[in-house]
């Protein structure tokens, strides 16, 4: 799958901002059909970082949100700044 098709946009909420600071974790809205492996591959390819784990959640509105935890050697804050989240 095309990485740009899998990862659609950052999911910016109060909870996701706390996850960036406390857990080195980012939240993204992803394509509904994508799997955790698809999200991991796409994120590692787009941002050149190592992903520790991916958790997904489908909201009542039908959006799929992926919570992506980065390895300790990479900073979620740096990626958030590059994306303009902060």
Swiss-Prot record:
Belongs to the universal ribosomal protein uL23 family. Pfam families: Ribosomal_L23. It comes from the Archaea. Part of the 50S ribosomal subunit. Contacts protein L29. This is Large ribosomal subunit protein uL23. HAMAP family: Ribosomal_uL23_A (MF_01369_A). The gene is rpl23. Binds to 23S rRNA. One of the proteins that surrounds the polypeptide exit tunnel on the outside of the ribosome. One of its GO terms (molecular function) is structural constituent of ribosome. Keywords: Ribonucleoprotein, Ribosomal protein, RNA-binding, rRNA-binding. NCBIfam families: PRK14548.1 (NF011118), uL23_arch (TIGR03636). It comes from Methanothermobacter thermautotrophicus (strain ATCC 29096 / DSM 1053 / JCM 10044 / NBRC 100330 / Delta H). GO terms for cellular component: ribonucleoprotein complex; ribosome.
């Amino acid at each position: 799958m095309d990485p740009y098709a899998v990862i659609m946009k950052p999911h910016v909420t109060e909870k996701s901002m706390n996850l960036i600071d406390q857990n080195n974790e980012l939240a993204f809205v992803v394509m509904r059909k994508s799997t955790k492996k698809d999200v991991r591959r796409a994120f590692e390819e787009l941002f050149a970082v190592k992903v520790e784990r991916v958790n997904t959640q489908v909201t009542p509105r039908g959006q799929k949100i992926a919570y992506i935890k980065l390895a300790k050697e990479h900073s979620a804050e740096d990626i958030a700044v590059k994306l303009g989240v902060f």
